[in-house]
Amino acid sequence: VNNVDGVTREALESKQREPLLHRIYGIADCWMISGVLAVSCITVSLNSNYIIVRDKERKISMDFVSSPILPRTISFSYLVFNCIVTFIINVLVFILSQIYLAAYGAYRISFLDFLAIIGIVLLSSLSASTLTYFICSFIQREAIRSPIVAIVSAGVGFLIGAYRPSNRGPKYIGEVTMFFPGTYSAGLFRNYFMSRPISLLTNLFSQAEYEVFKPLVGVLSNEFSLTLSFFGQVVSPLTRRGVIFAFVGIFLVLDIIFSSRNALNFLQSRKKKKKKEESSSKEGK
């Protein structure tokens, strides 16, 4: 944003283009908001898993396993709870961000883009829920979960490239980020948040009155890259959705497998404990 300011501020202020300046700042704001939403889907989901760890710590999960309820049903219940909480909170964040952008005349989203972003929030919430539930299924104590949440919350924005354009920094870092589902969510958010503002600004600069600012479009496009590249291959928005669905499917299967395995291990250990107690009582007699 500072580079953009250096190129445009003097010309904008000299021609009293305050509404235009707001639109340019709005593009930077859209970039940051899309990153915040991508990060928030992960951090909110990770924090929502406190109830899973709490149930394990208080031995409530053992009561569930001992009941006639199937282990996959228990896992599915936790996942649905996590996804609903994550989705609702991020929808509220999205609505507040749109109120902020509209309040100072930066950008008003179209109805179709609004529905598309709501869909991306739902897909990202589902992806984050399956991933974070898988991680937290191995955590038995809240004292372990809390520092993990703190570390992930601090670094996940850079890990998925939410706060850094893909064309900035070492190339290998950009390639590593492509192995995380949050990277594709951030890319989808950027496309729907920023494509229309940049398009409107391009059309505006094509007018003779604003022709002096036409080079700014190239600067903005370079500063806020909307493309994702996986080892030199450009990843289209449709492919990004497919990758997120693939991650959801993989971690959903892993969640079911490991929840069933954990339940089986618990029941076996309980039977062994019961047999040991019975043998001890017989010896006592």
What is each stretch, according to the model?
Residues 60-61, 74-84:
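Short hydrophobic alpha-helical segments within the ABC transporter permease transmembrane module
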Residues 36, 55, 78-79, 117-121, ...:
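Residue-level recognition of transmembrane alpha-helices
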Residues 28-51:
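Long, hydrophobic alpha-helical segments
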